[in-house]
């Protein structure tokens, strides 16, 4: 600093002053020697003055810089000791060399020098030895949250205590809004047959139970119609409700059942959305999904993330009406007449229900003067379906309208109508490309609705209370024009679908099922032919026997059978094996794991109704009904699939979804 002043402020001005003094004294000497002497004296005085002031200035600057340097060093020392940031120095063996006072208060030990990080703070050691080069990392340690920065070359760890921020953020998240819509599934049906006194008593009972439940959990509840409530709560309240598995479902069902009025609830919940309108839309969408799955359950949705389900463990009561069947039939008729042609497609490896309902839709299209085509893959059929297809070959007017996916893709247009039967999952249809090519799509299914669904269908007819899709299609005939009578082969195929899905009218069979079967019989359905379709050969029998032979009981009547890793089994054989196992004493639910012809691992699940196998299969990406469900797994072995199944069963018994 002094060199700077000497160089820039003393050296050159002083030289200039001396030179000017000499020149001026020489010039004035020729005129007057005393004037020249005066100039010399003045120059000397100025030079001395400049030296003096320059010296004082330099001293003042030196003093200022010295004081400033001292203050900076002092502040650095105080910062290391007093600032609210932890500093930890460690050696090459990850032992503590020094910590500042701020950080030392977090440790239990008074003397930390020489202590191993692995013992006093293994979380810190993980940060130091980790490969993360992103800079700031967050860790949890002793009820605190720290943001950390590691300087590995200098062996320094900086820690910022963010516990207060995280606690505040956690509190903010816990208090975010949650919107719920509560629906009394079958309130109207029960209320219609009651007198005013009983209806009022039922209404008071349900309202009182829901109000007490809401008050218990600090939920705002408001009744908006006779069978609908809305509720506002927070995410913290929602978490508590999930922990208790929404016991209000069981309470309402059990309490009303004692009065011979088994009322059930469906609850749709939306959360993780700041916009209240979108939050309400999420809740309504969740409720629609809950009702589509049969009711008596809770569905929780967020904008991003997996949908969660609770309840739905009881067999749903039949709620569909003739009025709905008529409305759907008329809507389907209108869509058919507006199209140029109709294509019908079911799920891969179609069963009798798919073929029967497809032929039924084809006949409905012909009743409305439109050509219809059933899409199948000839090489991917079970033996019973092959026998049905062989019989159809005797009917030229029918067989000519059965086409492959390639033919359908070549002929489908923007005005064509595609009807998807017996499934609502895009991943399960015979040909995904055909589904994507269709502008107008109708879905008719009897499986409980899952999260995966056909995008933007123009008409949806899903009735999980029906025995089969064939039953639903049969009911639509009554409201169609009589231009074309239902033929014997269509009626027989539809009856076959009902027989297969109900296991000869023993499972999921309601009064409407018998009505549909009776109607089909009146149209000429051949029951003897149905039995011929369902006959099995010796190979099928022996394969099924081998599967049943591998049966093992896992948990409270849960029977599991597995095929060999390299032996392929058709889906029908696996399903039949599951049915056979279910007929054995002590078996409440059966699961058959096999290698399918498409190289996927398939799991067929059956139950007597006390155990909801659909919930178990949904945990593995599948679905179905309470007593009849299945799934397919990719890139796993049979042994690995069995482990996944056992985990899903364990989660089911724990009440997890």
Swiss-Prot record:
Subcellular location: Cell membrane
Top-level taxon in the UniProt lineage: Bacteria
Pfam family, one: GGDEF_GdpP
Annotated keywords: Cell membrane, Heme, Hydrolase, Iron, Manganese, Membrane, Metal-binding, Transmembrane, Transmembrane helix
Region ranges (DHH): 342-498
Spans through the membrane: 13-35, 37-53
PROSITE patterns cross-referenced by the UniProt entry: GGDEF (PS50887)
EC code: 3.1.4.59
Gene3D superfamilies: 3.10.310.30, inorganic pyrophosphatase (n-terminal core) (3.90.1640.10), PAS domain (3.30.450.20)
GO CC field: plasma membrane
Residues that bind Mn(2+) 2: 353, 422, 446, 501
Cofactor note: Binds 1 heme (probably heme b) per subunit. Binds 2 Mn(2+) per subunit.
Membrane topology of the entry: Multi-pass membrane protein
Purpose of the protein: Has phosphodiesterase (PDE) activity against cyclic-di-AMP (c-di-AMP). Overexpression decreases export of c-di-AMP, leads to slightly increased susceptibility to the antibiotic cefuroxime and somewhat slower growth in macrophages. There are at least 2 PDEs for c-di-AMP in this bacteria (this one and pgpH); this may be the major PDE for intracellular growth in host macrophages. During host infection c-di-AMP is secreted into the host cytoplasm which leads to interferon-beta production and secretion by the host.
Protein name: Cyclic-di-AMP phosphodiesterase PdeA
Species: Listeria monocytogenes serotype 1/2a (strain 10403S)
Gene: pdeA
